[in-house]
């Protein structure tokens, strides 16, 4: 569930420091790389892989190609399968990009991650952190069971639904 820019920072801060140099959060070039300076800052501080959301297929700007090249170079990617920030604490529809990548690299495991409280802690359009409890829950590293993109999307969606059910109990208890 992607609800704020805090998501990426929370994920990165939960990883061991010695792994950070091999992790690339995938980010929209039109937002995080509007200028060369902005792109440099994004790359320097969080090692982003900037992609064009509307990249031309079979070109140097093809987002799938850029992500596959990073995986082939040994990087782990942080992908937000919804593709954009959604409504706070609500899961949006998973887009096909992650399924296309995994269909081409079925030997690569994915780890579903479920987050809560991020949208309240840093609401969309705001610059000030608010003092709310936020949590990050990691799923199990998983291989896809098929190379069919529709089946992969169903598998990933199912993983998120299971995590949502499992951790919704925790969320409800925390709010009481």
Ranges and model annotations:
Residues 1-55:
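Catalytic core of membrane glycerolipid acyltransferases/transacylases, capturing the structured
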Residues 60-176:
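Non-catalytic C-terminal accessory region of glycerolipid acyltransferases
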